[in-house]
Amino acid sequence: MGKEKTHINIVVIGHVDSGKSTTTGHLIYKCGGIDKRTIEKFEKEAAEMGKGSFKYAWVLDKLKAERERGITIDISLWKFETSKYYVTIIDAPGHRDFIKNMITGTSQADCAVLIVAAGVGEFEAGISKNGQTREHALLAYTLGVKQLIVGVNKMDSTEPPYSQKRYEEIVKEVSTYIKKIGYNPDTVAFVPISGWNGDNMLEPSANMPWFKGWKVTRKDGNASGTTLLEALDCILPPTRPTDKPLRLPLQDVYKIGGIGTVPVGRVETGVLKPGMVVTFAPVNVTTEVKSVEMHHEALSEALPGDNVGFKVKNVSVKDVRRGNVAGDSKNDPPMEAAGFTAQVIILNHPGQISAGYAPVLDCHMAHIACKFAELKEKIDRRSGKKLEDGPKFLKSGDAAIVDMVPGKPMCVESFSDYPPLGRFAVRDMRQTVAVGVIKAVDKKAAGAGKVTKSAQKAQKAK
C-alpha cells in the first residue's frame, strides 16, 4: 500500500443546471468508491426508467435521495482518489441545507470547485445578479475556503461545439467576478470540460486541441496540467491545527451503563488525551478524561478531524450537553461568551433587519437565539471597507459589523483563533437568512465552576 494518501475535502458549487451532479458523479464513478455491481444496478434502473442518457448524475441523485431521507449511506460513495489525495465531497448544493451545512459543517472544505455551464445562454443565467453561483462563491470565500478551481462545463454544447472563443469569453467573465469576491484568478485553475462526455475530466480531450492546459501561480508553488483531476491533485494540502489549544464541540452526551457519562464530538483543534483535565463551557464544569475512544477502540490521543467519545468521571448527563465545548483546563480553556462582534452578510431576508432582531444562530453544534444588539457599520462585502456608521437597518445583500448577545449561555470563539467555532448561520423562517464570522468575543469572567473530585486529584498528582 505504501504511505496513506492525505485526505482533503472539496465542496462543489455552481448554478442548478451547470452540470454539477454529472461532473461530480463522473469523478466518483471513474475514480471512486462505487463498486461495479452498484453501477450496473444503477444503469439498469436508469435504462428501465428511460433515463439512458443519465449515467453520472443518476449516481448522485440516488445518493442524494438516500441522504435526504436520512438513510445513512456508505459514505465511501462520496469519495474518490487522485494520485495524491483521498477526496471527500462534503456537500453538493441543491441539498436543502447546503448553506447551513457549509457553515456548521462537520468539516471545512479545503477547496471549492465552481462549475459553470458554457452552453448558449446557460452561463449568463447562472452568473446573473440572482444566480446562486455568486452566493455560493461568496459564501465559500467568506467561510475561509481560499482555494478555487473552475470547471467550464458542457463544452460539447457550445456553438459551435468545443468553441475556444466561448471558453475564453467565459474565463474572462468569471475571472472578473471571482476577483470581486476576493479570489486571485492567477491562483485558480480554469479547465474546459464535459462532465457528460468526459472531456478533460481524467484524460486530455482530443476535441479541444487549442487548449494548452491550465496554470496557477502562487507563492506556495506553481502548478500546471490539463485535466480537472490534475487540478484537484494540485490543491495545497491543509494544515491540521494540532498546535492550537483543544476545542471539541459536543454533538451528544451519552450515559452508558457500567461506564458512566460519555460526551461525543469532533476534535476541531488541539489534541485530546486520557488523563487530561478538561473544562466544558459555557457550563463551567471541569473534570478528568478517563479514556478516549474512536470506533470502539481506545486511543492514546485524538487529533483534529477525529470523531470521538470520551469517558469523564463525576459528571452527570445533566451537567453537560450538545453545543457545549470541551477544552484543556490549563491551556486557554473555553469560556462563556457574554457577547461578540461579527461580520455578517445578509443573504435572503424579505424585509429589513434592525437592532433588536433575535433569530437563531447555528454555530458549531450550538443552536441558540442571539440578538443583534447594535449595527455598528455597513461595509463593502469584498474589501471590508466601511461604507457607513451605525446603519438603521440591513437588507439582503448587505454586509455589516454587528454586536450580538446570546439569549442563553453559549461558547463561541473568534474565527481567526478557532475557525470552526467562529462561523455561523443565522436561521429564521426555516431558511438561512445570513452568515457570519466572529471577529472578537467578550468572554464572561467565570466564577467558581464545578470542579470534580477526579479533576482535583489529577491536578494534585501533576
Swiss-Prot record:
The modification N6-methyllysine is found at K165. The modification N6-succinyllysine is found at K392. SUPFAM superfamilies: EF-Tu/eEF-1alpha/eIF2-gamma C-terminal domain (SSF50465), P-loop containing nucleoside triphosphate hydrolases (SSF52540), Translation proteins (SSF50447). Pfam families: GTP-eEF1A_C, GTP_EFTU, GTP_EFTU_D2. It comes from the Eukaryota. Residues 14-21 are annotated as: G1. InterPro entries: EFTu-like_2, G_TR_CS, GTP-eEF1A_C, P-loop_NTPase, T_Tr_GTP-bd_dom, TRAFAC_GTPase_members, Transl_B-barrel_sf, Transl_elong_EF1A/Init_IF2_C. Residues 91-94 are annotated as: G3. Keywords: Acetylation, Cytoplasm, Elongation factor, GTP-binding, Methylation, Nucleotide-binding, Phosphoprotein, Protein biosynthesis. The modification N6-acetyllysine is found at K165, K172, K273, K392, K439. One of its GO terms (cellular component) is extracellular space. The modification 5-glutamyl glycerylphosphorylethanolamine is found at E301, E374. Residues 194-196 are annotated as: G5. Belongs to the TRAFAC class translation factor GTPase superfamily. Classic translation factor GTPase family. EF-Tu/EF-1A subfamily. NCBIfam families: EF-1_alpha, PRK12317.1. This is Putative elongation factor 1-alpha-like 3. It comes from Homo sapiens (Human).
